[in-house]
């Protein structure tokens, strides 16, 4: 799906900027650095998760009818 055309037009070791400048990505392009130069503090430790024990199982209570609204069957 277009791969035949894209292989000849795209190189993985070059970039083209908005101004049209071609930047080659090779070992000479990059500077050597060390992560120790950045002086980044270590991340704070993650808090320990708190697990709550489930309570005892309770049987749901039936809804109580209001006795004053009950009709007398007789």
UniProtKB/Swiss-Prot annotation:
Topology class, membrane: Lipid-anchor
Biological process terms in GO annotation: anatomical structure morphogenesis; viral budding from Golgi membrane
UniProt keyword annotations, A-Z: Host cell membrane, Host Golgi apparatus, Host membrane, Lipoprotein, Membrane, Myristate, Palmitate, Phosphoprotein, Virion, Virion tegument
Assembly and interaction partners: Interacts with cytoplasmic envelopment protein 2; this interaction is essential for the proper localization of each protein to the assembly complex and thus for the production of infectious virus.
Entry's Gene Ontology cellular component terms: host cell Golgi membrane; host cell plasma membrane; membrane; viral tegument; virion membrane
Region (Disordered): 36-74
Chief site of localization: virion
PTM: Myristoylation and palmitoylation (probably on one or more of the nearby cysteines at the N-terminus) enable membrane-binding and Golgi apparatus-specific targeting and are essential for efficient packaging.
Pfam families tied to this protein: UL11
Protein name: Cytoplasmic envelopment protein 3
Protein origin, superkingdom: Viruses
Species this chain originates from: Equine herpesvirus 1 (strain Ab4p) (EHV-1)
Job of this protein: Plays an important role in the cytoplasmic envelopment of tegument proteins and capsids during the assembly and egress processes. Also participates in viral entry at the fusion step probably by regulating the core fusion machinery.
Location relative to the cell: Virion tegument; Virion membrane; Host cell membrane; Host Golgi apparatus membrane
Motif (Di-leucine-like internalization motif): 15-16
